[in-house]
């Protein structure tokens, strides 16, 4: 008797087609970075970038030497007190002299090029600044390094508020270099054959987005002209700009622009 083998039943396999998702690019309305919502690395990068550009870099109290504290806002210059005299039952008023109060968590520090930790922290901050300003990332040696004599060619000042670096200015020494020029503010044209005797050059100045319009940039400028050269306070017009951005031009106009007899506004710059 012959045996018949039943044919084996083939298992069906479900085919799955995998399509790569099309990257969806969006631009953050607050920090202005463009990133892909489908990319995990982009999402992480945006989160970091967003926080740094809006709120500044977290800053250790051990970084930098405090050279200026920000005065607290006072509603009254003097405090009035009154008391009742036991002798004649009259109310007598007197005033205490006003005292300068300072914010405990708001100050400006100067970076020492000889202290590696604070230099690294400042360089990390400058990376953020240069990204936003679309500026070169290799122009930090003048304040972050020292020459053979142990001196630097500039200064970096950081504005710290609530344990975050929310502003920075880097200053280059340009005294006796003939690099000073006058720039026509509205056209960016350089005035020929005139060399102002400028002493300091503003390489970078930046304030994080959430702290703008609070006078921080002006405070940084004031500290720079008073503290960059030991024992010397330079005049405002001796503080020169380097290719100011649109917002930088507005700041320059209010801080140290000079009106020419032609009616044009000029700002000191250096090249």
From Swiss-Prot:
<feature type="domain" description="N-acetyltransferase">
    <location>
        <begin position="109"/>
        <end position="271"/>
    </location>
</feature>
<keyword id="KW-0863">Zinc-finger</keyword>
<dbReference type="Pfam" id="PF13880">
    <property type="entry name" value="Acetyltransf_13"/>
</dbReference>
<dbReference type="InterPro" id="IPR028005">
    <property type="entry name" value="AcTrfase_ESCO_Znf_dom"/>
</dbReference>
<feature type="zinc finger region" description="CCHH-type">
    <location>
        <begin position="26"/>
        <end position="50"/>
    </location>
</feature>
<dbReference type="InterPro" id="IPR028009">
    <property type="entry name" value="ESCO_Acetyltransf_dom"/>
</dbReference>
<dbReference type="GO" id="GO:0008270">
    <property type="term" value="F:zinc ion binding"/>
</dbReference>
<keyword id="KW-0131">Cell cycle</keyword>
<dbReference type="GO" id="GO:0005634">
    <property type="term" value="C:nucleus"/>
</dbReference>
<comment type="function">
    <text>Probable acetyltransferase required for the establishment of sister chromatid cohesion and couple the processes of cohesion and DNA replication to ensure that only sister chromatids become paired together. In contrast to the structural cohesins, the deposition and establishment factors are required only during S phase. Acts by acetylating the cohesin complex component SMC3.</text>
</comment>
<keyword id="KW-0808">Transferase</keyword>
<keyword id="KW-0862">Zinc</keyword>
<keyword id="KW-0012">Acyltransferase</keyword>
<keyword id="KW-0479">Metal-binding</keyword>
<dbReference type="InterPro" id="IPR016181">
    <property type="entry name" value="Acyl_CoA_acyltransferase"/>
</dbReference>
<protein>
    <recommendedName>
        <fullName>N-acetyltransferase ECO1</fullName>
        <ecNumber>2.3.1.-</ecNumber>
    </recommendedName>
</protein>
<dbReference type="GO" id="GO:0061733">
    <property type="term" value="F:protein-lysine-acetyltransferase activity"/>
</dbReference>
<keyword id="KW-0539">Nucleus</keyword>
<dbReference type="GO" id="GO:0000785">
    <property type="term" value="C:chromatin"/>
</dbReference>
<dbReference type="Pfam" id="PF13878">
    <property type="entry name" value="zf-C2H2_3"/>
</dbReference>
<dbReference type="InterPro" id="IPR000182">
    <property type="entry name" value="GNAT_dom"/>
</dbReference>
<dbReference type="GO" id="GO:0007064">
    <property type="term" value="P:mitotic sister chromatid cohesion"/>
</dbReference>
<comment type="similarity">
    <text>Belongs to the acetyltransferase family. ECO subfamily.</text>
</comment>
